[in-house]
């Protein structure tokens, strides 16, 4: 739990599935909105306040082996009620600097699979379907459990649809002394 200025006490789960997310279940919190397009601005504003509140107070966001992943990427609001579409759950991912994902978020679904497996909500091989704010669907399952170093983990499988939205061609001049890239830190 965390107290977020202007919102109040927020109950959330923290999980990693390629990035760290705060999973905020609507049933465990009191929000004046639901997960619909009409409330996207409230979702963004609230999601960013929660993310910033957690980042400013929760110093437990530490990846055990990759220091550059020691941050909260976003807030995922979840509604675990069966949806009219037939999906098991609906979620909205507010990430980065206030963007909303068009899909249920692959890394977010991976983290949710870990949460559901930890709570014994599902067994290996059980399939859950997740719907996004746009209506797109991902399916997730846990295919195995294993140790990641000394940490319990799951190997999730996520299935969804992706669409090509553009193409890019990069070129470099062979005389460019940093044509292979550079990094400043």
State what each model feature region is:
Residues 1-185:
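Active-site proximal loop and beta-alpha junction motif in alpha/beta enzyme cores
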């Amino acid at each position: 739990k965390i107290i977020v200025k202007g919102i109040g006490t927020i109950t959330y789960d923290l999980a990693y599935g390629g990035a760290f997310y705060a999973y905020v279940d609507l049933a465990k919190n009191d929000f004046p909105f639901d997960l619909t397009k009409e409330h996207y601005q409230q979702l963004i504003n609230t999601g960013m306040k929660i993310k910033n509140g957690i980042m400013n107070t929760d110093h437990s966001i530490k990846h055990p082996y990759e220091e550059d992943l020691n941050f909260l990427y976003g807030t995922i609001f979840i509604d675990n009620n069966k949806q009219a579409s037939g999906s098991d759950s609906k979620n909205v991912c507010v990430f980065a600097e206030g963007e909303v994902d068009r899909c249920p978020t692959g890394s977010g679904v991976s983290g949710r699979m870990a949460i559901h497996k930890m709570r014994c909500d599902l067994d290996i091989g059980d399939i859950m379907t997740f719907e996004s704010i746009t209506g797109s669907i991902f399916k997730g399952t846990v295919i195995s459990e294993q140790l990641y170093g000394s940490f319990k983990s799951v190997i999730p499988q996520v299935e969804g649809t992706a669409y090509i939205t553009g193409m890019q061609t990069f070129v470099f001049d062979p005389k460019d002394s940093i044509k292979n890239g550079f990094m400043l830190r």
